[in-house]
Regions:
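Short, extreme N-terminal segment that most often corresponds to the first beta-strand
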Residues: 2-30
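Charged, amphipathic alpha-helical linkers/stalks
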Residues: 32-50
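Charged, low-complexity surface segments at secondary-structure and domain boundaries
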Residues: 19-24, 39-44, 74-80
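Low-complexity intrinsically disordered segments
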Residues: 48-132
Length: 132
């Protein structure tokens, strides 16, 4: 007997459904640690601090310039290759498919971090794991 479970993306398996997981190649001039620090700071500096009424009046385009806290925590986790568990499937994938694995980061973030996600997509060689 075989059980088949339909999923939307690989991130559905490893995180809750409001998460986005990106595999990012560091194609910047920053070191891996500098890039990690930058992503955390970028996320903090783009948090929306206004009130709900202001948020409701904003267009979706304006909202995409901010990161919001998700109802369940609104987390951001950035891991270098060396910080990944050896059994983690993405680390295994990096080992099998990519040269120079230490140039990769795994970014796990809540979908409501629109500004951070947009920066990752626009500035890093990033793959959303739902596309793997």
């Amino acid at each position: 007997m075989k059980l088949i479970i339909a999923i939307q993306s690989a991130s559905d398996i490893i995180t809750n459904s409001s998460s986005e997981v990106f595999l990012c190649q560091n194609n910047t001039t920053m070191s891996i640690q500098e890039l990690k620090d930058f992503l955390y700071e970028y996320n903090r500096s783009n948090q929306f601090t206004g009130d709900w009424e202001t948020w409701q009046k904003m267009s979706q385009e304006e909202r995409n310039n901010y990161d919001m806290g998700g109802g369940m925590g609104g987390f951001l986790e950035v891991c270098s290759y060396d910080e990944l568990d050896d059994d983690y499937w993405l680390k295994k994938l990096i080992n099998e498919c990519y040269d120079n694995p230490k140039q990769y980061l795994v970014v796990d973030t809540d979908w409501c971090h629109k500004a951070t996600i947009n920066w990752i997509i626009e500035n890093l060689n990033a793959v959303n794991t739902e596309d793997l």
